[in-house]
Amino acid sequence: MKFNFCLVFFPCPCYFSTVVYYVNEQCTMLKYALPLYPVVDAIDESWSYEHLDKLTKYNEFTDTQLLYSNDDVRDFNNTSRVPMPHQVLVANYTTPKSPVEGVLVVHGVGTGKTMTAILAMLNNINVPGGLKRGLVLTPNRAVLSAFRDELHAYYKSRFSDRHVNEFEMEKYLSETFAFNTITSFANTIDRTADVVLHKEWNATFVVIDEAHDLTMQGVDYPKINGFLKLLTSRKILLLTATPMRNNISDLVPLHNLLMRNRTHDITVEQFNRDMVVRINDVNDVYTVEKPNEYFRRKFAGLVSYLPSNGRDALDVNIVQVGRTGVYGLKYTHVVEHDMSDDMAMVYRTVDDATRNDRDVALLRQRQVSRFVFPDGTYGTTGYQSWMDSKTGRPKRKLLDALRGGASDRAAILDNVAKYSPRYAWIARNVIEAAERGEKSMVYDDLVTGSGLLVFAAVLEALGLERGTGKGAGSFLCLTREVMTVNAIVSAIKNIQQRQQLRRFRGRYRVRFASHRRSITLKDVIHEHVVAHRNDAETEQIIGRGIRYKSHANTIANWKSSTRPNVFIYRHATVDSRSPNTRTVDILMLATSERKRLNINSAISALSSVALTCNGCNPSSQTPPVPPAYRGYYKGVDVSDDNTIPLDPPRITNSFIVKLDEEFDFRRQNVTVKVDSLLKLFNLDPSSVEALKMLFVIMNTIQTHGQLDVDKYIDCNGQYVTISKCVDEFRQRPTFVYPYLVRNTSVYGVGVYRDALAESVITPNMMRDIERSVTTFPYPIDKLPVMVLQGLLETAIVTKGVRDPYNTLGDMVQYYAYGDNDPDVEAAVWLALAAGEGQDYRILTTVGEDGVRRDRYWINCPNRYVDRVVRMKSEREAQINDMVRSKRLKYYGTKNPTTGDFCIRTVPDGSPTNRRCVLTGRKCVTWTSSKLREIGSGVGVRVAANSPRKATCSAIEQEFGRLDALFAYVSCGVQAKRK
């Protein structure tokens, strides 16, 4: 029987369904023809609860094996490589066919985030239609090396039979996966044109490890954010165990990195105004922040959440040692150490001498609370007198003083307690543990002169040997002050060996990020940590020694039926002589608790709308529990009508066959006309149905990396790349390209960004085009102000702008052509960045006489001046408040174009402060004595004869570590005299 049929389209805000009508009027869905997945809301790139409910009924969410791998059977037969359910979940959601383009992976320390990213990349790149390569960005070289080694090891163990020999496999890996540090890659972005970046990196699977390092104030964040938005075809994984460290607003840059369009980015100001509710506590000590419903909607479907204690992967019991409910602390277990008389006297002296300078007082009190040298000095002064600055080892006189003429351990420890009761207690604990064959890890902040190396001196005074960790009576001190990265990596390999388990191994690490984030220690039974201002930092440190399968050797030697214990000690030095006074350690723990209350509320909100692996149990002998969607709202009851199974071929193969009838996609440069493309599907190119079909076709082409080469399509006589047609057609009703704007919304102008970027960088060219164009207006003055701001920011931070100050001056007329808040805010941003006051113009349609006419440019109206000045002051005040909260007197700014580093003074209202003419100047123009003072205030040791350039470099690094370094285009640019 011959059937006649026609193709009918039903428009839908989330996807297009295709229905075939047969002669017998029976209607059946075309299986394997078009994707029926829901998609994100185009208005703000967030998922509706209804769409999440639908999405979580599909195979990606419920299957416990990788959906698009032919090697699952072989892989699952090897129990050491069985992916855990939460890893499978993320890998399946980021396949080429999945509508999920980016995920913030908030999985706790020790849950295997590295392997999650590896599986996700392999489950995409190795799949037909997948992306062409992977890019892994890490915070430092040590993490980079560990990530690369793990990926190579996994790939070789699983796919070695795909390659002829080892050389070919290494070549494939080096060509397919790129590794770089975040800062290094950001610098590459800064000096590379957008068109080159797009050509090289489009269709890339991007993984950013420790993504929380990209802060709004950081220099690297705007570069990485801009780079990701250049890519028309990509998947993004942001890995972090601690997305929030100080405030809930730490989530803002992580949200923005996942957005495809700049118009959907949010600012910290918008976040604090619209997405959280603030409630002051009864004592008005701190502000309670609770996420609202808008917060949940913005992050819905963008997060995969799994807490460290949410997995049953730990084959050990975690025991928190110490008391709770002391000194006003509610939840924290504290191991208290009472100051000796000598230490208490010095501590009170510091408090009295620095009472008017609280930030200096806290720094010095932290030094005193750790160790006071025999002559009553502490910090840098004592360190220089009693320690060898080059080797980090104690001088003979310090060892003699610590021993106090005694020879037995107990007497020496009693003597050490006079200088540091904390170090004496920890030393006794780790030695006794070592004698039982138990490993210990001690983490101490690098508090100048009183930190890790001084504690190592205490162990040497007790007769232990500081070495590489091989000797039975030795200990290992991991610190960048005296060891290279290679030496640290080599030492860790020694201490991880199983045969070394019964030997003594002290574990000591400094607060250098490159090692805190890259070191993993196995079979640690005792973990000693210091007080921090946030629990996130403590959690990361503890996680270095407690991870999935980290205690396999301990369990193998365990003789009991119960699980072994791992003990956590949070140390705090207190003063029993002043029971009503909280020491610096207690203050830090209290601050940490307060921050944790707000962070917990945000985590709860995130988990309620996350793609969460609920009930994952990788260590259990029972089958893994499928993931579950823990929705804050269940939304509508959407039935599982996904008629497109995820394993058979769907649109890709059938569509490519039709394309090959018209032209060969295997050639590097090809062209196809819209008319002929639509006729392949028997559609009239001028019909509405054809436009709807073209939407689906173009969207499919763009999301398949293997098709993303130099392909061109004829859009009304303009030959442009397919991806540009796709971007344009997604938001606009016509294919007119590139300059005529009709029916363009705020969210539809993204297609013009690359067309205008060069013009923005060269303003004179843009003005020439405006004067020469007569047939239709050049669209630059019609674009929404948020798009203009994005274009300008792109131009400013690229090397194409030789003088950002003059560029801003030339482009100032394109800001703020209305009287609404976004327009004025854009003008304020421009004035703040340029270091100017009110030197800008506004495009208006109302003259001074109140008569409406065509748009024309006028100078800033007087009614705007006060408002702009106020908003600019508020913007500067926000930065100052942020720095004051860190108890700093100064902060750094860096010009993203020139690389100049400047220092600004935090205003405090004093006459001296107001007269500070140096504030905001380049660091190298400050006096050497002033630089030494600034360095001392942030813990940087500056020698008297140190060159100013070297001093500035050290201060810049410390400001960056303290999140007190901000991008500022006026840094190094001489502002005009008023």
From Swiss-Prot:
Its EC number is 3.6.4.13. InterPro entries: DEAD/DEAH_box_helicase_dom (IPR011545), Helicase_ATP-bd (IPR014001), P-loop_NTPase (IPR027417). Keywords: ATP-binding, Helicase, Hydrolase, Nucleotide-binding. SUPFAM superfamilies: P-loop containing nucleoside triphosphate hydrolases. The lineage of its organism: Viruses, Varidnaviria, Bamfordvirae, Nucleocytoviricota, Megaviricetes. This is Putative ATP-dependent RNA helicase. It is an enzyme of class 3 (hydrolase). It catalyses: ATP + H2O = ADP + phosphate + H(+). GO terms for molecular function: ATP binding; ATP hydrolysis activity; nucleic acid binding; RNA helicase activity. Belongs to the DEAD box helicase family. DEAH subfamily. A motif (DEAH box) lies at residues 209-212. ATP binds at residues 107-114. It comes from the Viruses.
